């Protein structure tokens, strides 16, 4: 019905927003011979529970999905699902922002428009605004979403880009951007390194939006040493740091205290 159609549209939009991450993950599949949807036992071969939950999988390096296959109950079609969250990191519900410690099995409850989708804490996730032409539209605004990491976290994700149309990447025509998250001594540093590499149609400049779930409005935030304007966001339960259009070859360093 109408509710199911709305739920489908929301997930379709999410796919578009996640395309920088998905595209980078597919590149990793190409270079490292890994599947995009990975059984838990691929990353955690020594964990007994990795073999006990075949219905869930890692979607690239950062996301964990557990599709619901049971009927939802009640007016909101709430469905329950057991999910195993591997240890060594905190996991955040992508839709609600709720934090869960790793190393446990939890029981989730999801309405029709959601499903159990979790992201590792302390890892930069590249995203983009919704666009219908999600692969070939130039990335003129890069969204970097970072859920809080544990003390001592130091994680890097490599954003991959090419023209999205040809096989010129086989001749080395592509670009990468290092996204790094560090947390130490009560300070969080997020770094967007200069873009390396070129390809046809590559944008020379882009805007940025740093999304910080779980960060309070009163937090002190700076961008390249200057105090930054932050915007509270209720859906994220955190703040957004908008960064105006910049040359892609200039670094961006965001500090949060």
Positions of the model-derived regions?
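Catalytic core of carbohydrate-active enzymes
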Residues: 1-189, 195-219, 249
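Generic structural motif
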Residues: 177-183, 219-223, 230-233, 256
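Surface-exposed interaction regions enriched in Ser/Thr/Asp/Glu
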Residues: 244-257
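Extracellular/luminal ectodomains and secreted, surface-exposed scaffolds of diverse proteins
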Residues: 224-247
